[in-house]
Amino acid sequence: MTELTLGSLFDGIGVFPLAAERNGITPIWASEIVPDAISITKRHFPDMAHLGDITKLDGGKIPPVDVITFGSPCQNLSQIGDKTGLNGAKSSLFYQAIRMIEEMRSANGNRFPAIAVWENVIGAMLSGDRMDYLAVLRAFTGAEIPVPASGRWADAGMVRGRRCDLAWRVLDAQHWSSPRLARRQRIFLVADFTGQRAGEILFKPRPVFQNSGLCSTGRLSAAAANRTDFIEAGRRIPIAQPFSGLRMRGGAKHRNLQMFLRSFGKRTDPFPTLLASELHPFAFWYEDDPIGGCVRFPTETECERLMGLPEDWTKYGADGKEICSTNRYTALGNAIALPCAAYIMAGIAEALGK
């Protein structure tokens, strides 16, 4: 079988390439502009070419690949952003990825890429009175897709247009690994340009949980908040209870006591979504010593665990120097949960390998 290849736009810290490599797909090139993110990825994928700014690339003049992945900027689509949607300065870069895909397909007789994967925040389904997501579907398919009769986009769906077979699904990272990851709801859209395999890739059941065993330290695990079976050496049971900074500030600002109290969460809650703009604190104590606990922020390594990434994935750049904490937290807040990406890459490898 011919080797499957991948190109990653808006690459970030290389989560899609990592997921691809683990499923036998070779990352060939990436496009990213943040220096530390590029350096982190170069360390892990020294043979992957870095092409730079997407706005300066011609899809017809770069190496064709079987799969193109992209998590285009979400700032203008997010419900905590400025809500300018696909017209916003950053989120409009979505169309640059579509342009590159079309240029590549035009240059090689519509053979490559066979598959495209788009990832974004669920706010994209609400942005612009839900018309921005319609624009996304039309940009991929080239079809005049109607707005659903309900006026709302479902969390999962399929469309077949003249350009591609398309499926989307909202995945929440907390359900895709054991120990439990942070809460992270994201849209994953798969477009199949050479067949009708999008639904097979995105909806077919596959194993996703990893055997984690017992943790041997009292530091926050991927289960960040909650596990009664999280037992450290010495049999002490640590407890982690996350806070929601947004709710806490909102409750204080609006003098809403119930909102403020809900910000403290429950021991059974997953850790809140990691954001590039802020960290969520959490209370940490041992079950046999609640008074001896503390409130702290997760470490960079703990944030990597909450995203399902290998420990110290973001610690060093290509030159071996440590990446500063602020830039590591920002990169992780912008990243994709690895188990979700790996599930999709497994589906692509299976579908294209037939």
Regions found by a protein language model. Give the residues of each.
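The conserved SAM/SAH-binding core of class I Rossmann-like methyltransferase domains
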Residues: 30-31
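Conserved proline-anchored active-site loop of SAM-dependent methyltransferases
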Residues: 6-20, 54, 64-81, 115-122, ...
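Conserved SAM/SAH-binding beta-strand->alpha-helix loop
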Residues: 34
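C-terminal target-recognition/interaction regions appended to catalytic cores
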Residues: 229-354
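Conserved SAM-binding loop
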Residues: 41
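Class I S-adenosyl-L-methionine
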Residues: 57-65, 79-273, 277, 294-296
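A short, Lys/Arg-enriched amphipathic alpha-helix followed by its capping loop at the start of a domain
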Residues: 15, 19-26, 44
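Conserved SAM-binding strand-loop segment of SAM-dependent methyltransferases
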Residues: 47-53
